[in-house]
Structure formats: C-alpha cells, structure tokens
Amino acid sequence: MAAPASDSGGSQQSPSSSPGSREGAGVAAKGAPDCGDAGARDAAETVSGLPPLEDYECKICYNYFDADRRAPKLLACLHTFCQECLSQLQLRAAAAAAAAAAPERPPRPPPWLCPPGAIACPVCRHRTPLPDSRVHGLPNNTKLAEAFPLALRAAHDPLPQDRLPPLPARLPAPAAAPPPTPAPPPPPSPAPPQPPPPPPAEDAAPGPRARPGLRAPGAYDSCQNCKRAALTAGCVCVVFSFLSMVVLLFTGLIFVNHYGGGGTPGGGAPPGEAPATGSPSPSPVGPICLSVASILALFSVVVTWVICWLKYRPEGAAAGSTGGSGGGGGPRARAAAGGARRSDT
C-alpha cells in the first residue's frame, strides 16, 4: 500500500508543481511575440524555398553575385564566393609563392598558400583544385545563379554591376502636358481680347536684350574657326610675300648691275658720255623688280602686324567692343576689360 501512496503523492506533487510550469509557460508566451517576426520570416523563407538574402552576396567583398565578373563560384568545400575575389586570392597566392622561393631557406608557407593549380577556401582552408589553373574553370553555384532576384538586387545594391534600374520618373512627363489644357477658360470672356497681345510683346522684349549679352556656343565656335582661318591665311601670305621679295630683290640687283647702263658688266657708262654704239640698252626689269620687292616688304610688315594684333590682343578689348555695340552691357564690359588688364599685368 505504500507504493500506491507514493504514487498518489507523486500524482499530487505534479499538480502542485504545475504553477511553476505555468509561470514558465507564461514567460515563454511573453517571449513568443518578440520572436514572432523572425519566425514569420523563417516560415516565409521555408515556404518560398529560396535561400535568405545574405546568401546572395559574397562573404569577402559583400557584393551581390551577378552573371559577369561576380559570378558565384562553388568550391569543393561547398562554400561560394565571387569570381573576382577568388581571382585576387589566386594572384596573392602566386605572389607569395614567388617571394617564398627567392631565399635559400624558404620560411614556412602560410596556411592559405596552395600549389599553382589549387586555391584555399578563406573560411575552412580546404584546398580546391583549379581546372587549367584558372578560377574561371570552377563551377557556378546554379542554385544561387538561377534563383537570384534581379529586381531585388537592383533595389538593395547601391552600385549594381550589370545595369542601372529604369527611371520611372520620365513616364509622368506626358501627364504634365494636361496643364496647358486649362488655357481654354480665357476664350469664354470675349470682352478682353486685347490684353493677350501685350504679354507676347513683353516676352519678346527680353529676347533682343539678351541677344547682345549672350552668345551661343555655335557662334563662338564659328568665330574661333574664322579667326583661325584668317591667321593661317595671313601667315601664308607673309611667307609668300617674303620669299617673293627676296627673289625679286636679287633679280633686280642682278639686272641693275649687268644691264643698268652700257659698258662692261658690273660697270655703267661714265656720266656725261653717251653709251657706245654696240652696248646693250638699259633694261627696266631691274628697277621694276626692286619696286615690287619693296612693295612686298611693306605688305609683309603690315600683314605681320595685323596678325600679331589679332592673336595677342586682350580679351577685354573684344568684350568692350561687344558691350559697346550692345548698349546695355557698359559696366560689365568695363569690369571685364579691367579684369583683363589686371591679368595681363
């Protein structure tokens, strides 16, 4: 009979211990709402059958995988990293191997150093052989590559690798066109048809005022092209005139010395004496050549001065001339001219 009593006592103690268990259940019930969101997220993930968003990024550079230079490469240890990070690890391993082979007694290689045809996992140090000693030969993680949401990546990644997301802000632009439609309300008032003409006159007035002050980029380029063409033509004219002057000068001197007067070459007839009957008559070619040479020399000097003036004149002078022609830009032109003088000094 003692055993049943003990059993009954045990059965009586179990109800007595129920308040504690009830308190534990209450604490668990209080903690349950805190982790309700996490449970809902886990449930959503398990229902969807897709890995969490953290699995779509490389654990080395924390960039999302893509189909180009950050392709998800699967190692033999089933760890996944992007192709670019694995390539950097391979290059560093090759550099460390070259540095270790230089001394006579090479030090102990680091744990991540592998043969040229293998790469060590940054997490577990497991060595994975590289096909053809290239990271490109590693297989891709097809589960991540096929299930990766591109739209989600474009929304979360501040610097997407493939392309920028489309700009939907331009779509409402056509909707901005309806505001001009309220213009029809003015027609119902036929009495004031004259007020509308003055606004166009006021709008047209600022146009001519702004024309002298502003210059379109096309006009500036055409002006620069014309100036460059004028300088080139002037330089060609100066060179041609100088060469022609030299040739004509030598030709004129030769004709004057040899055919300037009768007698032997190089000496004319003495003054006051008539030329001999057999002597050649003086040729006018020499004086003509000398005259043309002098004219060409003067022309070369003038053109050279004009070219130097056009090329080296200060911009303030041009601004002052344009401002004076515009009429309303006097103070601005003076300020520009003063700034140009200060910059020249």
UniProtKB/Swiss-Prot annotation:
Keyword tags: Membrane, Metal-binding, Transmembrane, Transmembrane helix, Zinc, Zinc-finger
Ranges where the record places region Disordered: 1-43, 159-213, 319-345
Zn finger region (RING-type): 58-125
Keyword ATP-binding: no
Major place of residence: membrane
Gene3D superfamilies: Zinc/RING finger domain, C3HC4 (zinc finger)
Membrane topology label: Multi-pass membrane protein
Transmembrane portions of the chain: 236-256, 290-310
GO cellular component: membrane
Annotated Pfam families: zf-RING_UBOX
SMART domains hit by this protein: RING (SM00184)
Composition skew (Low complexity), residue ranges: 1-21, 202-213, 332-345
Localization in the cell: Membrane
Domain of life: Eukaryota
Protein name stated in the entry: RING finger protein 228
Organism lineage: Eukaryota, Metazoa, Chordata, Craniata, Vertebrata
Chain's gene name: RNF228
